[in-house]
Swiss-Prot record:
It comes from Schistosoma japonicum (Blood fluke). GO terms for cellular component: extracellular region. Transmembrane segments: none annotated. Residues 1-26 form the signal peptide. The presence of a 'disulfide through disulfide knot' structurally defines this protein as a knottin. Disulfide bonds join 61-75, 68-79, 74-84. It is found in: Secreted. Pfam families: UPF0506. Its main location: secreted. This is Uncharacterized protein SJCHGC06711.
Length: 87
C-alpha cells in the first residue's frame, strides 16, 4: 500500500511533468517571443515577425521593410524579393 508521503510525491511529480508538457507544446500569443517553427511558434492566425535569425515576436502581420516568405504574411499583402512592401 502506498504511504501518504509517496502519494503526495507522486502527485507533485505528475503535476510538474504536466506543466512542463503544456509549456513546451503551447503556442505563443501576440507580442510574445517566438521562433518560426516548432513548439515556440505563434498561435494561428499570428505569425512570427523576425527580429533576428529565426527568432522574433508574434504579430498579426509583418510591416513593410521586414523579411517575409509569403505575401499573405505582410500587412501590405505584398512580399517581393524576401521583404514586405510598404502600403
Amino acid at each position: 500500500m502506498m504511504s501518504t508521503q509517496h502519494f503526495i510525491l507522486s502527485l507533485t511529480i505528475l503535476i510538474i511533468i504536466s506543466n512542463l508538457h503544456d509549456e513546451v507544446n503551447a503556442c505563443r500569443e501576440l507580442g510574445e517571443e517566438c521562433v518560426t517553427r516548432g513548439p515556440k511558434s505563434c498561435c494561428e492566425p499570428l505569425i512570427c515577425g523576425l527580429k533576428s535569425h529565426g527568432t522574433g515576436v508574434c504579430v498579426k502581420c509583418i510591416p513593410g521593410g521586414s523579411e517575409c516568405k509569403k505575401s499573405e504574411d505582410c500587412c501590405s499583402k505584398r512580399c517581393k524579393s524576401g521583404y514586405c512592401k510598404f502600403k
